[in-house]
Amino acid sequence: MAQNWTAWIAGAMRMDEATWARHANPWSAWTRLPILPAIVVVLLLRDTLGVATWVLLMLPIIWVWLNPRAFPPPATLDAWVSRAVMGDKLWVERDRRPIPQAHAAMAQGLSLLQAPALVPLVWGIWAKDAPLALTATALVIAIKFWFLDRMVWLYDTRAATEDDAR
């Protein structure tokens, strides 16, 4: 099976076991939330910011890479967002460790659902229409949270199955 795009991204980010463990820290997951809004706001203000736009765009982009490495692993994986991260890891590794079809179908569907929301987001940025761009950003984030909730379900399902097998 061809490598999935999420696995390619994780590979480019050098997401090894230690990095995933650190990324499961709730501080890591929650401090990623403002990345997309920050990028959108900087792009909306590009005329006002001028050359500083490029510097301000680089900060959240650098944070995307640094973030999973910036915090220690959590003491437990009990937090909702920690389980979401570990479910996301299972999703990324689905070519090597198959996941139940129902989880795969829902995750793929939610990923596809984000695509139409990107159209008004990109248009809003291009047209400097802040209400449109920010509404679309909120929609993309809402769909991402739905996806993360499904990743929690995937992680909990896998954890229960593996616990039952012991």
Map each language-model feature to its residues:
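Core segments of transmembrane alpha-helices
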Residues: 31-40, 103-122
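Short membrane-interface loop/juxtamembrane segments of multi-pass integral membrane proteins
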Residues: 81-109
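Short, charged cytosolic
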Residues: 1-12, 77-92
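Hydrophobic alpha-helical membrane-embedded segments
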Residues: 33, 43-75, 143-145
